């Protein structure tokens, strides 16, 4: 989940609402679910086992720049663990993310060959240079509320 400053406001509220729904689904289906938040640095939260850390996450605003490098490294590390080796990945972001080094993007292809599906949920209408690296990116458009 992209927690950079560009996600502040309506995108942040939308992302948090979706995250709450994903938590509910994981509980109902008794599925593992792991959250990796990122802006410049990353935080990892096992959302079914570490509720305190999850509540702490919801109490902090989204801030900072965006760098997906460490998030991707954390994702690949998790996918290499037995517990998550059959997992799929969902990246929630406005996709105002600078591209990573080609070797990291190549690792996405390696994991895709192992059966991992990479999905995205783009909040907003920013140009998206990541589309070719995902199996599918869903898009939610929104309008900025005007203040008078």
Q: Which sequence ranges carry the predicted segments?
A:
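Active-site-adjacent loop/helix micro-motif of nuclease/hydrolase catalytic cores
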Residues: 10-14, 68-70, 99-105
């Amino acid at each position: 989940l992209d927690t950079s400053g560009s996600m502040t406001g309506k995108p942040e509220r939308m992302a948090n609402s979706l995250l709450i729904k994903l938590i509910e689904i994981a509980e109902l289906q008794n599925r593992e679910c792991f959250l990796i938040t990122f802006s410049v640095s990353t935080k990892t939260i096992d959302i079914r086992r570490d509720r305190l850390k999850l509540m702490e996450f919801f109490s902090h605003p989204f801030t900072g720049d965006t760098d997906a490098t460490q998030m991707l490294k954390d994702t690949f590390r998790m996918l290499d663990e037995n517990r998550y080796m059959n997992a799929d990945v969902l990246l929630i972001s406005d996709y105002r993310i600078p591209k990573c080094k080609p070797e990291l993007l190549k690792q996405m292809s390696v994991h895709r060959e192992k059966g991992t599906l990479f999905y995205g949920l783009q909040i907003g209408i920013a140009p998206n240079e990541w589309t070719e690296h995902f199996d599918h990116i869903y898009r939610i458009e929104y309008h900025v509320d005007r203040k008078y």
